Amino acid sequence: MNAFALIPFAVFAVFYVTLGVVARDFYRVPMTVAFLVAIASALFLGKGKKFSEKIEILAKGMGNQDIMLMCLIFILAGAFAAVAKASGAVDSAVILARVAIPDSFMVAGLFLVSSLISLAVGTSCGTIAAVAPIAMAFAGPLGLSPALLAGAIVSGAMFGDNLSMISDTTIAATRTQGVDMRDKFIANVALAVPAAMVALFIYLVAGSSQTGVETIPAGAAASFKDFVLILPYVLVLLLALLGMNVVIVLLLGTVLAALLGVAFGPLNFWGALETAGKGTLDMSETLTIALLSGGLFKLVKESGGIEWLTYAIARKVRGPKSCELGAFFLTGLVNLFTANNTVAIVIAGPVVRELGKKFKADPVKLAGIIDIAGCFIQGIIPYGAQILIATGVARSAGYEFSGFGLVSCTYYPFLLALSAFAGILLSSLRKSPEAGK
């Protein structure tokens, strides 16, 4: 155990936040540079290992399987967003959406769609990768804030990630606490649904108050061509709902968008290739952040930082309620460092289970709490996969905003955390017969 191993995370936070406040614009502070500064501090502060060994640890963290899969999703999401836009699918989607959905409900509607898809498929990253390109299509034409649209998508994705029976976080939370998924679902619904309803209302109000300049008038008539050009979006959503791997989903969507773009004139063969290539390059900053964050976490973990954090929180627990609060903070802090809620639950879960047995805390409550803590932090950290995918897709569509700019529009995770605290402090969660076992 080594508390000093956590210093690089403090270096990252101080560097990024301080310069962002000084500049009054977080987008002016490259997050990649902040991570490089933090990694440099980790390499020079660590003791007991040769510098070459630390570099190897850094490389292993950057090359982690989960990080590589995340990067592949970033690349494909960038290609799909760029090709779909160039093919004319964006304008067609906007024209058809305005026929079926009032403009004032567009943001709230995307929150609902994202929630339902994530609940069905159990993956927030896959949901955001599938829905974000569609959401960005509505920003300019309807005069809506792209950050608000992205925030609604991320919020909905985290709702499903927390509740879905097939979500990695649900599986990890229930297995580490030894409880049934159904019991955990019931406990979580009591907290998640009220938070989601408040978020829906906020997005409805926020979407109704948008006063941007529309580039596609409300009276634009839909044509047969519009129905054809939106097929890539339809295909991506349907395949995502069917549970197909997100890599295959995005590949098929990109190919179909390119074929339709060539067939209906906006693109030719070489133009489609060039557009796809540019879309992938637009994700370069997102890819770099993912790689660097993976390497930094590996350095900190190997130096004993995560182990010390677990010990420090566990020794503060004195009873059932403090056990529940400790479970929330332990999972949340580990997630803050790992930038992966499933990994955070797997790391914190066994410790939480032992504390629960010792202080007779309800394991069903604990399973719900650690899942909520993971989803809360994962939905608001600007270097997490969900925020990175959303900002990357937005950048591919021509919209620039910082991760913090997006987080300020991601309301649901904050509401979910507040709901969880209320549940803990007021003991409003259903009492499980397994408590104290």
Predicted regions and their residues:
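Hydrophobic transmembrane alpha-helices of multi-pass small-molecule transporters
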Residues: M1-I75, N188-I289, L425, L429-K437
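Core transmembrane alpha-helical segments of multi-pass membrane transporters/permeases
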Residues: T32, F44, I55-G88, S104, ...
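Juxtamembrane helix-boundary/capping and inter-helix hinge elements in multi-pass membrane proteins
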Residues: G48-F51, G63-I67, A86, G143-A147, ...
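Re-entrant/interfacial helical elements at transmembrane boundaries that shape
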Residues: G126-F138, V154, M165-V179, L309-T310, ...
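Hydrophobic alpha-helical transmembrane segments of multi-pass integral membrane proteins
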Residues: C71-F80, I101-I134, A314-E354, K358-F359, ...
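Juxtamembrane and boundary regions of transmembrane helices in multi-pass small-molecule transporters
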Residues: F26, S155-M158, N162-A221, G379-I380, ...
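Alpha-helical transmembrane segments of multi-pass membrane proteins
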Residues: S104-I117, G143-G160, S322-N335, F359-I380, ...
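Membrane-interfacial loop-to-helix junctions in multi-pass transporters
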Residues: N64-M70, I95-V113, A139-L149, S223-L231, ...
